[in-house]
């Protein structure tokens, strides 16, 4: 059976238990503090140990790497030494073999040099022979050409005419070349003068001309140069067409020994004045435009009253232009201003004239010229015949007017 406990016992127990509990709690706290203090140095020691281990592993790795690098360098050095030794051995062997090869090729090289020198000498000889052959061919061909030319000159019947033709062509070429050069010089001078005039117009100029007047003068000069060039081209074409006839006429005139140039020019001027007084207005040979207009008015006035049938004006204009071109051509070229008659000129005048005009003018003129020869000049016979015809026409016109 259990013993009964009093309240006093219970109180003791409580107090005693609390005291025990407090006594027990104090060492537990102390233990916990001591444990913490113990754990801290343990943790520090663990960290130090881990650090030392890592450093040791790193040192080991570095050492291993250094050892590997050293071994690799040693291996490379060994390989390089082996290669160098192999090259030395090879060079030594090549030197030995090259010495043997040079000793073997020395006579071959000497033979090649001898062959090249011999071939060069042969090539030089061949070139000299070819040059000599070319010279011989040139000499032979030149002699053959000279023989042909001499044979042609001997066989030609008109040797003098051919030489005169050649001389005339050369002189004409020189003349035309001079004219072209002169035209170029004139153009250059005109351009230079225009530039100078422009410069002067910008500044002070003592002349009374204005800028417009200077430009107008320059334009007129250029137009004159262009017209001159055209006329020269036209005369050249006409001369090329009529050159054989003119050359024959000039040679014939030289052989016949006609009068001087001044007398012929004076005779031409006199005959032209006399022709203008009695020829038909459609066949007038007047070079000026004023006389042509007056004659055309007379033609239009007389055509209604006169009984004669005049030809068309187209023929007169064509004939007049041709004769003007011929007169200008004779003046522009280096020929003498005389008029020599040929069959071609006679046929031309007949083709251009009408049947009524063919009867008494040109045929009688040419016949008289053939009969007289050197004694009577062409212009004198022409003037005499034309004066007779003019008198006859005037008398017929007066009789017709009286009858009307």
Swiss-Prot record:
Keywords annotated in UniProt: Calmodulin-binding, Cell membrane, Membrane, Nucleus, Repeat
A cellular-component GO term for this protein: nucleus
InterPro entries in the record: DUF4005, IQ_motif_EF-hand-BS
Signal peptide location: none
Keyword Cell cycle recorded: no
Span(s) of short sequence motif Nuclear localization signal 2: 226-233
Location in the cell: Nucleus; Cell membrane
Domain of life: Eukaryota
A Gene Ontology molecular function term of the record: calmodulin binding
Positions of the UniProt region annotated as Calmodulin-binding: 8-25
Motif residue range(s): Nuclear localization signal 1: 11-18
Family note: Belongs to the IQD family.
Job description of the protein: May be involved in cooperative interactions with calmodulins or calmodulin-like proteins. Recruits calmodulin proteins to microtubules, thus being a potential scaffold in cellular signaling and trafficking. May associate with nucleic acids and regulate gene expression at the transcriptional or post-transcriptional level.
SUBUNIT field: Binds to multiple calmodulin (CaM) in the presence of Ca(2+) and CaM-like proteins.
Name this protein carries in UniProt: Protein IQ-DOMAIN 12
Organism per entry: Arabidopsis thaliana
Organism ancestry: Eukaryota, Viridiplantae, Streptophyta, Embryophyta, Tracheophyta
